[in-house]
Amino acid sequence: MDWWLSWTVRDYVDLNKSQRQLLETQLDEFHRWHQQTQLKQYASFVEQLSTELDQPLTEDRLQTLNQDIQQHWLESLDYLMPGIDQLFVSLDSEQWQQLLDNITESQEEYARPFLKNEQQRIKQREKRFTKGTKRWIGKPSAQQQLMIHQWAQQLHPTAQLSLARQAQWNLDATELFDQRHDLDSDTRQRRLRQLLIGDKDNLTAEDQQALSDNRQQTYQLLMDLQRSLTEKQQGKLRQQLINYHADFRFLSSKFDDIALAQ
C-alpha cells in the first residue's frame, strides 16, 4: 500500500525535494505500522471468509463485510492523517491547482464511458464487473454472464452524479486549502478527513435512493452468483483466499522477525 500511495501522489502533483522526503518518511512509518498491526487483521478477515464459502450469502452478511472493509480503510486513513495534513499545508497554489486538475481529469476519464448512450453504459458496467469476477472465480458461465448483464441493465446511471460531486468536492477542498494556515491542526485534519471519506448527507433524496437501489441490486447479484458457482469456481475462489491469507501472514511475520532481531 505504501508504494501505491507514493506513486499515486506523484502522479497527481509534482512535489519539491522536501515534500518528497516528507512523503517517503511518512510512508515508511505507515508501512511499519501497517505491517505490524493491520496485516494480521486482514489475514483473520480472509480466513473467516474462507470458512463461510459453503454458507449462502445474505444481505446482512454483505453489509457487515462492507462495513468491515470500510473500517479497515478508515484505520489506515486515520494513521495517515497527520502526514496528509502536513503535505496538504505545504502545497503552494500552483501545486494545488495541478492536483485538482489531475483528480478531475481522472474522474472524467473514469466516467466518460458511462456518459454515452444507455447501451454503451450497460456494456461498460458488464465489462468491468466481469473483469473483476474472472479474477476471483474464473470465466463466468453463460448463466452467470446473463445475471451480470441483467444487473447492469437494472442499475441507475450515476456518472453525472459522480462528476457533480467531484465539482462540489473541488470547491469544498479549495475552501479548506485557502484557510489551511488559519485553522488549528485538529480542525484542519477533521475537515480533511471528511473530504477524503466523502459526504453523502448533502445528496438529494432521489440520488440517495438511486445509490441505495444500486447497492441492493449489487448485493442480490453477489448472492445469486455465489449460489450458481460450479465446483471449479468454488475451488478457484477458495484458493484465492488461501493465497491472500498466506501473503498477509508471511508479510506480518517478516515484521515479527525484524522486531525480534533488534
Where are these regions (language model features)?
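Short, low-complexity cationic-aromatic patches
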Residues: 13-21, 73-82, 92, 137-146, ...
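Extended, structured, electrostatic nucleic-acid-contact surfaces
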Residues: 1-12, 82-85, 116-136, 215-223
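A cross-kingdom marker for long, charged
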Residues: 6, 166, 170-262
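Amphipathic, charged-and-aliphatic alpha-helical interface segments
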Residues: 27, 150-153, 217
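Mature extracytoplasmic or organellar-lumen-exposed domains after removal of signal/transit peptides
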Residues: 21-23, 102, 125, 150, ...
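Extended amphipathic alpha-helical interaction segments
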Residues: 85-204
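N-terminal Sec/ER secretory leader and immediately downstream segment
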Residues: 1-90, 94, 98, 102, ...
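Short, contiguous, well-ordered secondary-structure segments
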Residues: 63-65, 69-72, 111-114, 118-121, ...
